[in-house]
Amino acid sequence: MDGTLSGRFMRGLALAPDRPALRADGVDTTYRELHERALVLAGSLRAGLPDPPPAVGVPVGKGPTAYAALLAGLYSGVTVVPLQPAFPAARTRQMIEAAGVGALLADDDALPALTALHAEGVSLPTLFAPGGQPMPALAVDADSALKAPMPARPSDIAYVLFTSGSTGRPKGVPVTHANTAHYFQLLDERYDFGPHDVFSQTFDLNFDCAVFDLFCAWGAGATVVPIPPHAYAHLPEFVAEQGMTVWFSTPSAITLVRRTGGLEPGALPSLRWSFFAGEALSCKDAEDWAVAAPGATLENLYGPTELTITITAQRWTPGRYLNDMVPIGAVHPGHETLLLGADGAPADGDEGELCIAGPQLTPGYLDPADDTGRFLEHHGHRFYRTGDRVRRAEDGGWLYLGRQDAQVQVHGVRVELAEVDAAARTCPGVEDAVTVAVPVDGTVELALFHTGVPVPPARLARHLRELLPAAVVPRAYHHLDALPLNSNRKTDRRKLASRATAMRQSAGAARTHERRQESQ
């Protein structure tokens, strides 16, 4: 089998043709059925267009047809661009234009998105289009089915994902078949997945961790089960019902499950593997999950999209670590690391901004202008600047310190927001905490949001003054039932920062009004 993503599915097809590749909405789809469906869709796409498009957009949800559409895009031999139907149409249009998308593969979940895109001036041939949508429709023709997936070269772009850009314009990250081939070869060597495994699929298909779910499973002949939102309320029952053996999510999912009482000792006995990525993993979250899933090996994974899904792994062992956070572990074999100091020059010590070079590195952003400041040449190698500050651990792996842009100056004191978060979590009654910086009259104040028991602000501030310099103790405290999550189910720090700023401005306006009333 070749090393492409299509080749990984073909490997699963050879291992387990009549076992379910997918169980979505209660419907099992075997490897043979999904393969045949994807061949029909890919062939129909190529037959319906005069020339293969440079890229196909896949605006889909997580229903049974979504996965056939994604696989069909790969089978057609062109670049796949997963699109989130819930995103604003103007943003999706920017992605479509940046990636050179020439056709769409859609499912029923995409109908509102297609209508909104059409209103934005997008009119693209659309295959498997839901009824009533405004795009030019391509016919699904079984007679046009491909006999086999179209071949791809290692240097060909397998997929493009988009990350947020500092300009507000999404940045397109192309990932090649060579990138993914190296990645999955390492994972095949590290893990023992097989046809009897059942994988969770918590991530939306436009999030790169979904590629881990799908192609780890499909390369092993295993089954993928998309997790519906309502399942988190009764996760132990859902996991048991599905016979799930492999779990992968952001750490925020642990908070959701804890809140519904799903982390009781032994509550998740069927799990063999548990993976977390996308945000920092606290030791408390790891401990609680390990108690609920005592038969599972737990790993903390880390990696920006530019380095193909994940680039480090740390196998969890109980213990205390810096800022009470699980280390991110060692960088994958075959890669080089470089640390940069605050001045952007190579650092001499064991702490700095993590830069990585190697076979999982993207060729560069779709728009070369976005490369500026993100890549550097050092001793003949091209490195990606992750923007993450790390410290070397005793075992040679890496401890995550926080984002470069999450290090702020407060009253002349440099502070890591992650350090304030960690200190707040040690306060009795606090379950989770996130600190944000609020601009105030040319300087910055810190505001802290927390979940758990509504701890009085004075008590929380007193607790923090025992652990932190007085200058960096937050000025504002807000209790929430739950921290907001973004579309990738990570804690939405931008929303919290906007909320804190709005509340600070509202409070300031109220004080001004009171002073005016008193002076009258």
Which residues are covered by each model-predicted region?
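ATP-dependent adenylate-forming carboxylate-activation enzymes
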Residues: V60-P64, V81-I96, D108-L111, G132, ...
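Gly/Ser/Thr-rich phosphate-binding loop
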Residues: G219-A222, F248, R258-M325, E336
